[in-house]
């Protein structure tokens, strides 16, 4: 029997293209950027605490601000990605959190640092759900598990290497410039993503 229109459309959506490899590379780089930006503050905390004369409790609030925002905004951002597509949402949220990564380096007291990290967490919250949706559109089911493993491994590798990178950078530049430098990496990624990626194969 001849396939109906719905079957043909489904087959076309499931037909893999080589472009998915480029999507995979971009998302793996994004995984690394997410952990680079979120983990770096742990190594930079002593420098920040010394400059602002913060207590350990205050620094704990700064860490918690990120986690709270991440928890609150993850589901709403994922729903937004389902509605408008991941091309727009990932570009926007990566720009958002990159700006607030840089804003962390421009903080001038405890409150400004707290706000910057909260808004940074709000941006990062939607990254992984949006990437999962991207995989669902671009990657065949039989390859998604493998790609997810690369994605997670890249994130955790970046998390492991970030303290080493940050320690080395602190010998050259200030803690403030480290945040600005890391924020710029996200802006570059967002530009490439928004210019190249499309929501559907």
Language-model segments: residues:
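Conserved MFS/SLC helix-loop-helix module at the cytosolic interface between two early adjacent transmembrane helices
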Residues: 72-111
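Residue-level signature of mid-helix packing/kink "hotspots" within the transmembrane helices
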Residues: 39, 67-75, 125, 159-160
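Extracytoplasmic
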Residues: 22-56
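Cytoplasmic helix-loop-helix junction between adjacent transmembrane helices
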Residues: 116-155
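Helix-loop-helix hairpin linking two adjacent transmembrane segments in secondary transporters
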Residues: 151-200
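Cytosolic juxtamembrane N-terminal segment immediately preceding the first transmembrane helix
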Residues: 2-36
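Helix-breaking motifs and short loop linkers at transmembrane-helix boundaries and internal kinks
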Residues: 53, 85, 106-112, 123, ...
């Amino acid at each position: 029997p001849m396939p109906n229109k719905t079957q043909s459309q489904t087959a076309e959506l499931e037909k893999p293209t080589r472009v998915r490899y480029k999507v995979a590379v971009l998302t793996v780089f994004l995984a690394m950027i997410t952990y680079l930006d979120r983990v770096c503050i742990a190594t930079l905390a002593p420098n920040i605490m010394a400059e602002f004369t913060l207590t350990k409790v205050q620094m704990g609030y700064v860490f918690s601000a990120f986690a709270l925002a991440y928890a609150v905004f993850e589901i709403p951002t994922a729903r937004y990605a389902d509605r408008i597509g991941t091309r727009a949402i990932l570009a926007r949220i990566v720009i958002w959190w990159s700006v607030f990564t840089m804003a962390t380096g421009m903080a001038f007291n405890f409150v400004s640092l707290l706000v910057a990290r909260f808004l940074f967490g709000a941006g990062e919250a939607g990254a992984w759900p949006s990437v999962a949706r991207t995989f669902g559109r671009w990657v065949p089911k039989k390859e998604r598990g493998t790609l997810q493993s690369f994605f997670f491994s890249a994130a955790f590798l970046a998390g492991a290497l970030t303290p080493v990178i940050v320690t080395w950078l602190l010998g050259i530049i200030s803690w403030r410039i480290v945040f600005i430098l890391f924020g710029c990496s996200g802006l570059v990624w967002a530009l490439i993503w928004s210019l190249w990626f499309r929501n559907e194969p």
